[in-house]
Amino acid sequence: MSWFTPEVIDVIIQVVKAIVVLLAVVVCGALLSFVERRLLGWWQDRYGPNRVGPFGMFQIAADMLKMFFKEDWNPPFVDKMIFTLAPVVAMSALLIGFSIIPITPGWGVADLNIGLLFFFAMAGLSVYAVLFAGWSSNNKYALLGSLRASAQTVSYEVFLGLALMGVVVQVGSFNMRDIVEYQAQNLWFIIPQFFGFCTFFIAGVAVTHRHPFDQPEAEQELADGYHIEYAGMKWGMFFVGEYIGIILISALLVTLFFGGWHGPFGILPQVPFLWFALKTAFFIMLFILLRASIPRPRYDQVMDFSWKFCLPLTLINLLVTAAIVLYNTPAVAAQ
Protein backbone atom coordinates (compact mmCIF):
# COMPACT_ATOMS: atom_id res chain seq x y z
CA MET A 1 0.00 0.00 0.00
CA SER A 2 1.47 3.32 -1.05
CA TRP A 3 1.65 6.17 1.42
CA PHE A 4 1.41 8.69 -1.41
CA THR A 5 -2.35 8.78 -1.78
CA PRO A 6 -3.93 11.78 -3.57
CA GLU A 7 -4.82 13.28 -0.18
CA VAL A 8 -1.23 13.02 1.08
CA ILE A 9 0.11 14.52 -2.16
CA ASP A 10 -2.30 17.46 -1.81
CA VAL A 11 -1.09 18.06 1.75
CA ILE A 12 2.56 17.95 0.63
CA ILE A 13 1.84 20.42 -2.19
CA GLN A 14 0.11 22.82 0.22
CA VAL A 15 2.99 22.60 2.70
CA VAL A 16 5.54 23.31 -0.05
CA LYS A 17 3.49 26.28 -1.25
CA ALA A 18 3.31 27.65 2.30
CA ILE A 19 7.08 27.32 2.78
CA VAL A 20 7.79 29.01 -0.57
CA VAL A 21 5.43 31.92 0.16
CA LEU A 22 6.70 32.55 3.70
CA LEU A 23 10.37 32.28 2.68
CA ALA A 24 9.71 34.72 -0.17
CA VAL A 25 8.18 37.17 2.32
CA VAL A 26 11.25 36.94 4.59
CA VAL A 27 13.62 37.47 1.64
CA CYS A 28 11.57 40.44 0.39
CA GLY A 29 11.56 41.91 3.90
CA ALA A 30 15.36 41.74 3.99
CA LEU A 31 15.70 43.21 0.47
CA LEU A 32 13.43 46.13 1.36
CA SER A 33 16.24 47.58 3.45
CA PHE A 34 18.30 48.12 0.29
CA VAL A 35 15.28 49.28 -1.74
CA GLU A 36 14.38 51.85 0.91
CA ARG A 37 17.88 53.35 1.00
CA ARG A 38 18.06 53.54 -2.80
CA LEU A 39 14.66 55.21 -3.04
CA LEU A 40 15.42 57.66 -0.22
CA GLY A 41 18.68 58.60 -1.93
CA TRP A 42 16.88 59.13 -5.24
CA TRP A 43 14.05 61.19 -3.78
CA GLN A 44 16.36 63.31 -1.59
CA ASP A 45 18.80 64.00 -4.47
CA ARG A 46 21.78 62.23 -2.92
CA TYR A 47 23.73 59.00 -3.34
CA GLY A 48 22.29 55.86 -1.85
CA PRO A 49 24.41 52.76 -1.18
CA ASN A 50 26.73 52.58 -4.21
CA ARG A 51 30.01 51.01 -3.07
CA VAL A 52 29.37 47.28 -2.65
CA GLY A 53 28.83 45.72 -6.06
CA PRO A 54 27.33 47.37 -9.17
CA PHE A 55 24.93 50.17 -8.11
CA GLY A 56 25.35 49.00 -4.51
CA MET A 57 23.36 45.84 -5.22
CA PHE A 58 25.42 43.71 -2.82
CA GLN A 59 24.96 46.11 0.10
CA ILE A 60 22.23 43.90 1.55
CA ALA A 61 24.63 40.91 1.49
CA ALA A 62 27.25 42.98 3.33
CA ASP A 63 24.68 44.04 5.92
CA MET A 64 23.58 40.44 6.46
CA LEU A 65 27.17 39.24 6.90
CA LYS A 66 27.81 42.02 9.40
CA MET A 67 24.68 41.06 11.34
CA PHE A 68 25.52 37.33 11.34
CA PHE A 69 29.03 37.92 12.72
CA LYS A 70 28.08 40.42 15.40
CA GLU A 71 28.24 39.12 18.95
CA ASP A 72 24.86 37.87 20.17
CA TRP A 73 25.30 39.51 23.55
CA ASN A 74 22.80 39.53 26.41
CA PRO A 75 23.38 42.33 28.94
CA PRO A 76 23.74 40.90 32.47
CA PHE A 77 20.77 42.87 33.82
CA VAL A 78 18.10 41.61 31.38
CA ASP A 79 15.53 38.85 31.84
CA LYS A 80 17.19 36.50 29.36
CA MET A 81 14.26 34.24 28.50
CA ILE A 82 11.78 37.04 27.76
CA PHE A 83 14.55 39.15 26.19
CA THR A 84 15.22 36.33 23.70
CA LEU A 85 11.54 35.53 23.15
CA ALA A 86 10.54 39.09 22.17
CA PRO A 87 12.18 39.28 18.70
CA VAL A 88 10.99 35.75 17.88
CA VAL A 89 7.39 36.70 18.64
CA ALA A 90 7.73 40.02 16.79
CA MET A 91 8.85 38.41 13.55
CA SER A 92 6.83 35.19 13.64
CA ALA A 93 3.49 36.87 14.49
CA LEU A 94 3.66 39.11 11.42
CA LEU A 95 4.92 36.26 9.24
CA ILE A 96 2.07 33.99 10.32
CA GLY A 97 -0.34 36.88 9.75
CA PHE A 98 0.72 36.89 6.10
CA SER A 99 -0.59 33.33 5.73
CA ILE A 100 -4.15 34.55 5.09
CA ILE A 101 -3.19 36.64 2.04
CA PRO A 102 -4.38 35.10 -1.26
CA ILE A 103 -1.63 35.97 -3.73
CA THR A 104 -3.20 34.35 -6.80
CA PRO A 105 -6.20 32.02 -7.28
CA GLY A 106 -3.92 29.02 -6.70
CA TRP A 107 -1.28 30.43 -4.35
CA GLY A 108 -1.73 31.18 -0.69
CA VAL A 109 -0.84 29.61 2.63
CA ALA A 110 -4.28 29.27 4.26
CA ASP A 111 -7.84 29.86 3.08
CA LEU A 112 -9.67 30.62 6.33
CA ASN A 113 -13.31 31.63 6.65
CA ILE A 114 -12.20 33.84 9.54
CA GLY A 115 -9.15 35.20 7.71
CA LEU A 116 -9.50 38.81 8.85
CA LEU A 117 -10.09 37.78 12.46
CA PHE A 118 -6.95 35.64 12.31
CA PHE A 119 -4.98 38.66 11.07
CA PHE A 120 -6.14 40.72 14.05
CA ALA A 121 -5.20 37.91 16.42
CA MET A 122 -1.64 37.92 15.04
CA ALA A 123 -1.50 41.72 15.06
CA GLY A 124 -2.52 41.69 18.71
CA LEU A 125 0.15 39.09 19.47
CA SER A 126 2.86 41.38 18.07
CA VAL A 127 2.04 43.91 20.82
CA TYR A 128 3.28 41.39 23.40
CA ALA A 129 6.66 41.26 21.65
CA VAL A 130 7.10 45.00 22.16
CA LEU A 131 6.06 44.78 25.81
CA PHE A 132 8.39 41.81 26.37
CA ALA A 133 11.30 43.73 24.82
CA GLY A 134 10.73 46.88 26.88
CA TRP A 135 10.14 45.12 30.21
CA SER A 136 12.88 42.50 29.95
CA SER A 137 15.56 45.06 28.96
CA ASN A 138 15.46 46.72 32.41
CA ASN A 139 16.16 50.03 30.70
CA LYS A 140 14.07 53.15 31.21
CA TYR A 141 14.28 54.20 27.55
CA ALA A 142 13.28 50.71 26.40
CA LEU A 143 10.34 50.67 28.82
CA LEU A 144 9.12 54.11 27.72
CA GLY A 145 9.42 53.09 24.08
CA SER A 146 7.48 49.87 24.64
CA LEU A 147 4.72 51.72 26.51
CA ARG A 148 4.44 54.20 23.67
CA ALA A 149 4.41 51.44 21.08
CA SER A 150 1.80 49.30 22.83
CA ALA A 151 -0.54 52.25 23.48
CA GLN A 152 -0.19 53.44 19.88
CA THR A 153 -0.64 49.96 18.40
CA VAL A 154 -3.68 49.05 20.50
CA SER A 155 -5.30 52.42 19.73
CA TYR A 156 -4.82 52.24 15.98
CA GLU A 157 -5.78 48.56 15.79
CA VAL A 158 -9.27 49.66 16.86
CA PHE A 159 -9.56 51.81 13.74
CA LEU A 160 -7.87 49.14 11.65
CA GLY A 161 -10.75 46.82 12.55
CA LEU A 162 -13.51 49.41 12.20
CA ALA A 163 -12.19 50.44 8.77
CA LEU A 164 -12.52 46.84 7.57
CA MET A 165 -16.02 46.34 8.92
CA GLY A 166 -17.47 48.30 5.99
CA VAL A 167 -15.88 45.79 3.60
CA VAL A 168 -17.10 42.84 5.68
CA VAL A 169 -20.65 44.25 5.83
CA GLN A 170 -20.79 44.61 2.04
CA VAL A 171 -19.31 41.19 1.26
CA GLY A 172 -20.87 39.31 4.16
CA SER A 173 -17.71 37.29 4.81
CA PHE A 174 -14.37 37.42 6.62
CA ASN A 175 -12.81 35.18 3.96
CA MET A 176 -10.12 36.99 1.95
CA ARG A 177 -10.83 35.13 -1.30
CA ASP A 178 -14.54 35.98 -1.03
CA ILE A 179 -13.59 39.65 -0.71
CA VAL A 180 -11.35 39.49 -3.79
CA GLU A 181 -13.98 37.71 -5.89
CA TYR A 182 -16.67 40.20 -4.80
CA GLN A 183 -14.50 43.03 -6.14
CA ALA A 184 -14.05 41.15 -9.42
CA GLN A 185 -17.83 41.24 -9.93
CA ASN A 186 -18.34 44.78 -8.59
CA LEU A 187 -16.36 47.97 -8.01
CA TRP A 188 -13.06 47.77 -6.16
CA PHE A 189 -13.66 48.86 -2.58
CA ILE A 190 -11.37 51.88 -2.99
CA ILE A 191 -14.44 53.67 -4.42
CA PRO A 192 -17.36 52.72 -2.12
CA GLN A 193 -15.08 52.39 0.92
CA PHE A 194 -12.75 55.33 0.28
CA PHE A 195 -12.90 56.65 3.85
CA GLY A 196 -12.36 53.14 5.18
CA PHE A 197 -9.31 52.84 2.93
CA CYS A 198 -7.88 56.16 4.16
CA THR A 199 -8.32 55.17 7.80
CA PHE A 200 -6.93 51.68 7.22
CA PHE A 201 -3.83 53.08 5.51
CA ILE A 202 -3.19 55.61 8.30
CA ALA A 203 -3.73 52.97 10.98
CA GLY A 204 -1.50 50.53 9.07
CA VAL A 205 1.37 53.01 9.08
CA ALA A 206 0.87 53.58 12.81
CA VAL A 207 0.67 49.87 13.67
CA THR A 208 3.94 49.16 11.83
CA HIS A 209 5.59 52.10 13.67
CA ARG A 210 6.72 53.64 10.42
CA HIS A 211 7.45 57.31 9.92
CA PRO A 212 5.70 59.62 10.76
CA PHE A 213 4.30 57.32 13.48
CA ASP A 214 7.70 56.06 14.69
CA GLN A 215 7.58 57.79 18.10
CA PRO A 216 8.27 54.48 19.95
CA GLU A 217 11.72 54.41 18.30
CA ALA A 218 12.43 58.16 18.28
CA GLU A 219 16.24 58.42 18.38
CA GLN A 220 16.26 62.00 19.67
CA GLU A 221 13.94 61.20 22.59
CA LEU A 222 14.29 57.50 23.44
CA ALA A 223 17.62 56.41 21.90
CA ASP A 224 15.88 53.87 19.62
CA GLY A 225 13.25 52.86 22.19
CA TYR A 226 12.69 49.19 22.99
CA HIS A 227 15.49 48.15 20.58
CA ILE A 228 18.19 49.82 22.66
CA GLU A 229 19.66 46.72 24.35
CA TYR A 230 19.43 44.45 21.29
CA ALA A 231 22.29 43.57 18.93
CA GLY A 232 23.17 40.97 16.33
CA MET A 233 20.49 38.61 15.08
CA LYS A 234 18.00 39.56 17.80
CA TRP A 235 18.02 43.14 16.55
CA GLY A 236 17.94 41.80 12.99
CA MET A 237 14.70 39.93 13.68
CA PHE A 238 13.05 43.14 14.87
CA PHE A 239 14.46 44.92 11.82
CA VAL A 240 13.23 42.36 9.27
CA GLY A 241 9.93 42.03 11.15
CA GLU A 242 9.25 45.73 10.60
CA TYR A 243 9.64 45.32 6.85
CA ILE A 244 7.47 42.18 6.89
CA GLY A 245 4.83 44.35 8.56
CA ILE A 246 5.07 46.84 5.69
CA ILE A 247 4.62 44.03 3.14
CA LEU A 248 1.68 42.62 5.12
CA ILE A 249 -0.20 45.93 5.36
CA SER A 250 0.49 46.67 1.68
CA ALA A 251 -0.79 43.22 0.67
CA LEU A 252 -3.90 43.73 2.81
CA LEU A 253 -4.58 47.09 1.15
CA VAL A 254 -4.33 45.44 -2.26
CA THR A 255 -6.53 42.50 -1.26
CA LEU A 256 -9.23 44.47 0.53
CA PHE A 257 -9.48 47.66 -1.52
CA PHE A 258 -7.76 47.15 -4.89
CA GLY A 259 -9.11 43.85 -6.19
CA GLY A 260 -6.30 41.54 -5.08
CA TRP A 261 -4.82 39.68 -8.04
CA HIS A 262 -7.31 41.16 -10.55
CA GLY A 263 -6.22 43.87 -12.96
CA PRO A 264 -8.29 47.02 -13.63
CA PHE A 265 -11.26 46.42 -15.95
CA GLY A 266 -10.28 42.75 -16.25
CA ILE A 267 -7.07 43.55 -18.17
CA LEU A 268 -4.60 40.64 -18.55
CA PRO A 269 -6.26 38.06 -16.27
CA GLN A 270 -3.53 35.59 -17.32
CA VAL A 271 -0.94 37.24 -15.03
CA PRO A 272 -2.57 37.50 -11.57
CA PHE A 273 0.75 37.44 -9.71
CA LEU A 274 2.04 40.40 -11.74
CA TRP A 275 -0.97 42.54 -10.78
CA PHE A 276 -0.69 41.58 -7.12
CA ALA A 277 3.06 42.28 -7.05
CA LEU A 278 2.77 45.65 -8.84
CA LYS A 279 0.01 46.93 -6.57
CA THR A 280 1.79 45.72 -3.43
CA ALA A 281 5.07 47.34 -4.59
CA PHE A 282 3.23 50.64 -5.10
CA PHE A 283 2.07 50.75 -1.48
CA ILE A 284 5.48 49.68 -0.20
CA MET A 285 7.01 52.65 -2.06
CA LEU A 286 4.29 54.87 -0.58
CA PHE A 287 5.39 53.79 2.92
CA ILE A 288 8.95 54.77 2.03
CA LEU A 289 7.84 58.08 0.48
CA LEU A 290 6.16 59.04 3.76
CA ARG A 291 9.50 58.66 5.53
CA ALA A 292 11.17 60.92 2.98
CA SER A 293 8.59 63.71 3.01
CA ILE A 294 6.69 64.09 6.31
CA PRO A 295 8.07 65.34 9.65
CA ARG A 296 7.46 63.41 12.86
CA PRO A 297 4.66 64.85 15.04
CA ARG A 298 4.63 64.77 18.84
CA TYR A 299 3.37 61.64 20.56
CA ASP A 300 0.33 63.39 22.07
CA GLN A 301 -0.61 64.68 18.60
CA VAL A 302 -0.50 61.12 17.24
CA MET A 303 -2.85 59.86 19.96
CA ASP A 304 -5.19 62.86 19.64
CA PHE A 305 -5.38 62.30 15.89
CA SER A 306 -6.38 58.68 16.42
CA TRP A 307 -9.28 59.25 18.80
CA LYS A 308 -10.49 62.65 17.56
CA PHE A 309 -10.25 62.06 13.79
CA CYS A 310 -9.93 58.36 12.94
CA LEU A 311 -12.62 57.12 15.35
CA PRO A 312 -15.42 59.45 14.13
CA LEU A 313 -14.46 58.85 10.48
CA THR A 314 -14.55 55.05 10.80
CA LEU A 315 -17.82 55.06 12.74
CA ILE A 316 -19.52 57.33 10.19
CA ASN A 317 -18.22 55.16 7.34
CA LEU A 318 -19.50 52.00 9.04
CA LEU A 319 -22.93 53.49 9.81
CA VAL A 320 -23.40 54.79 6.25
CA THR A 321 -22.31 51.44 4.78
CA ALA A 322 -24.68 49.52 7.06
CA ALA A 323 -27.56 51.85 6.15
CA ILE A 324 -26.94 51.41 2.41
CA VAL A 325 -26.69 47.61 2.70
CA LEU A 326 -29.87 47.51 4.80
CA TYR A 327 -31.70 49.72 2.30
CA ASN A 328 -30.67 47.52 -0.63
CA THR A 329 -31.54 44.26 1.14
CA PRO A 330 -35.04 43.07 0.21
CA ALA A 331 -37.35 42.78 3.17
CA VAL A 332 -38.20 39.24 4.23
CA ALA A 333 -41.92 38.61 4.30
CA ALA A 334 -43.26 37.84 7.73
CA GLN A 335 -44.17 34.19 8.17
Curated annotation (Swiss-Prot):
It is found in: Cell inner membrane. It catalyses: a quinone + NADH + 5 H(+)(in) = a quinol + NAD(+) + 4 H(+)(out). One of its GO terms (biological process) is aerobic respiration. InterPro entries: NADH_UbQ_OxRdtase_su1/FPO (IPR001694), NADH_UbQ_OxRdtase_su1_CS (IPR018086). Keywords: Cell inner membrane, Cell membrane, Membrane, NAD, Quinone, Translocase, Transmembrane, Transmembrane helix, Ubiquinone. It is a multi-pass membrane protein. GO terms for molecular function: NADH dehydrogenase activity; oxidoreductase activity, acting on NAD(P)H, quinone or similar compound as acceptor; quinone binding. GO terms for cellular component: plasma membrane. Pfam families: NADHdh. The chain crosses the membrane at residues 15-35, 81-101, 114-134, 154-174, 187-207, 238-258, 270-290, 307-327. Its EC number is 7.1.1.-. NDH-1 is composed of 13 different subunits. Subunits NuoA, H, J, K, L, M, N constitute the membrane sector of the complex. NDH-1 shuttles electrons from NADH, via FMN and iron-sulfur (Fe-S) centers, to quinones in the respiratory chain. The immediate electron acceptor for the enzyme in this species is believed to be ubiquinone. Couples the redox reaction to proton translocation (for every two electrons transferred, four hydrogen ions are translocated across the cytoplasmic membrane), and thus conserves the redox energy in a proton gradient. This subunit may bind ubiquinone. This is NADH-quinone oxidoreductase subunit H. The gene is nuoH.
